[in-house]
């Protein structure tokens, strides 16, 4: 047996076959429950429209994170047998500004060399197809791409008629707190949250932002769920916001904190931009924190740019919340 129950003594070799069969049977029954739930809604297409599959995934992710944060579920190197000092990891440093300028140049060259008349004709055909519902839209989109119409132009040709989809942001509550139960860090975070609310006359308000082309939002949703269960008022920004859009939403919602979730290495470009946008709007008092996959080599630069706190992988939600609340209470 290793450590505190990482390898239990309940199962021996002769029982392992039954144990695996039992787990397999459990998975099959739970999967069937999900299938029946979807069927009752009229199939997967209907279920997706209601947002049920996405919500179930987010609930499972929140439970999992809560068990990890509380130590109930142990992961070697994360919350059990952690190294006293992490070895530095060499990473490929990419100059985002240079990449952006290079891509803009390529696009300019592409547009200068393409047949604009052919592009306009192809895009007009797409708009007409969407309007009349006559013809093969996919075929027309492929033809437009062949004459070098961009994906944005093709989608704009459709948007003229049908508009653009706007995601409905739904959140869950109570899932994270039901799993962490009496975790000391979680309880401490709730106490600080109550202290802030008493001092300011309202709950601390945080906006979780996904900026640029970072489409990974499950971690951000889990963090939002955890903060809400601690006592924060939480606003969730849509995917692919620009720093300007996120700053505007933060000001309109009068938040105390903007939490930038970064999983696509855009933090050195996007975090300074949102801080600058908040300054333009006269709201330098809104603090900006950063969470996600942030190399330690980038921490100093982010702090110089104005980030108030940085939370890397493996940071328990309650630990991050305590740090945020301590910053807010110190102001």
Q: Each PLM stretch: what is its role?
A:
Residues 41, 48-50, 60, 78-84, ...:
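Generic beta-strand/beta-sheet core signal
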């Amino acid at each position: 047996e290793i450590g505190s129950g990482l390898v239990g003594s309940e199962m021996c070799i002769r029982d392992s076959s039954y144990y695996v069969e039992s787990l397999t049977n459990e998975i099959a029954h739970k999967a069937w429950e999900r299938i029946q739930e979807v069927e009752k809604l009229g199939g997967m297409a209907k279920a997706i429209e209601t947002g049920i599959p996405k919500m179930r995934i987010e609930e499972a992710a929140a439970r999992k994170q809560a068990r990890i944060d509380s130590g109930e579920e142990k992961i070697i190197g994360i919350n059990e047998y952690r190294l006293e000092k992490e070895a530095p990891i060499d990473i490929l440093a990419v100059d985002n500004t240079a990449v952006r300028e290079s891509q803009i140049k390529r696009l300019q060259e592409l547009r200068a060399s393409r047949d604009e008349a052919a592009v306009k004709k192809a895009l007009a055909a797409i708009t007409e197809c969407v309007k009349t519902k006559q013809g093969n839209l996919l075929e027309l989109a492929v033809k437009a791409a062949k004459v070098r119409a961009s994906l944005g132009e093709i989608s704009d040709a459709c948007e003229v008629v049908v508009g653009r989809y706007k995601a409905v942001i739904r959140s869950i509550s109570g899932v994270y707190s039901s799993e962490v139960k009496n975790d000391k860090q979680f309880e401490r975070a709730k106490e600080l949250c109550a202290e802030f609310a008493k001092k300011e006359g309202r709950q601390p308000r945080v906006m979780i932002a996904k900026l640029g082309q970072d489409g990974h939002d499950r971690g951000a949703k889990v963090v939002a769920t955890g903060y809400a269960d601690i006592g924060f008022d939480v606003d969730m920004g849509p995917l692919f916001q620009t720093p300007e859009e996120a700053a505007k939403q933060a000001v309109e919602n009068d938040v105390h904190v903007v939490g930038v979730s970064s999983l696509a290495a855009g933090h050195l470009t996007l975090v300074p931009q949102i801080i600058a946008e908040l300054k333009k709007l006269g709201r330098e008092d809104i603090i900006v924190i950063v969470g996600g996959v942030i190399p330690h080599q980038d921490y100093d630069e982010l702090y110089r740019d104005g980030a108030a706190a940085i939370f890397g992988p493996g940071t328990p939600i309650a630990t991050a919340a305590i740090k945020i609340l301590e910053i807010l209470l110190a102001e």
